[in-house]
Structure formats: structure tokens, C-alpha cells
Amino acid sequence: MADSTHWSFPAPLQPVAAEVGFDLAHALDAVVRLSSRVPDDGFTAASLGTEREGNGVVIRDDGLIVTIGYLITEADAIWITTNDGRVVQGHPLAYDFTTGMGLVLPLGRLGIAPLTMGSAAKVGVDDDVYVIGHGGRA
């Protein structure tokens, strides 16, 4: 997989932990990087590539991760990278073709507290929304 370089938003664009109304450090830690490898002869290899990388969110105490499904479809290897740099292999547990979401089960202990699932129905006009990707720091 390609090496990632450390980049960050300028300080004025970063959220202030004391002002967001939730545990920002916990939210950042619950977002992991997923890297996957798909065989060259895979059905989706030509259109989606054989090396894929994206984000996932830990949603259960056992480390279960929800992600976008294309990252894991046909994957023969998955690596999970935590915010503190640990790398654990993962197993593609499920892919839902209707929603496009996938589930990855780590094959080792992540030691990350899961995020609590919310409801989009509770989000209103003018509410603040935060988009968090792997690598954020509080």
C-alpha cells in the first residue's frame, strides 16, 4: 500500500474540543484506516483497483467496524490502522449490496471504545455536523 503523509487542517479550521459538545478525542480514536488488497483477477479489480484505502468506525466492543463496502468487497487481505499507529489484520465479515456498507472484524484486539450510533432523524437544520477521517488528533 502507498505510504500516507501526515497532513492537518490549519489550526483555525480545526474544531475546539471544549466547544463541540461531545468527546472529540474518543470520536477521533474510533475512526480507523482500512487498507485492503484484492486479487488481480477479482471481478471489481479493473474498476475499483486492487489496492483500496479508506476509513471505518468502531461500533462494537469487540472492535467491529462499519465502512463503505467497496473497500472490502473481494478483499483477500485487510489491515486496520488505529489512531496511535497500531496495525491489526481484519476479516471482511459482511457486505450489504443494498446500502453499500460493509463490516470488518479485527483479528486482534484494537482496544478502542466504540462510538454510539445516533439517528439522522435527530439532526436538524443549522445543526453542526462533523466529518471525521482517520488520522485526526484532538
Positions of predicted regions on the chain:
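N-terminal targeting leaders that route proteins to membranes or the secretory/organellar pathways
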Residues: 1-30, 51, 64
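Generic structural motif recognizing short loop/turn segments at the entrances and edges of beta-strands
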Residues: 5, 28-32, 48-49, 54, ...
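Conserved active-site neighborhood of the chymotrypsin/trypsin-like protease fold
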Residues: 10, 39-41, 53, 60-138
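N-terminal post-signal-peptidase region of extra-cytosolic proteins
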Residues: 13-18, 43-45, 49, 112-115
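A short, Trp-centered hydrophobic/proline-enriched beta-strand micro-motif
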Residues: 26-47, 131
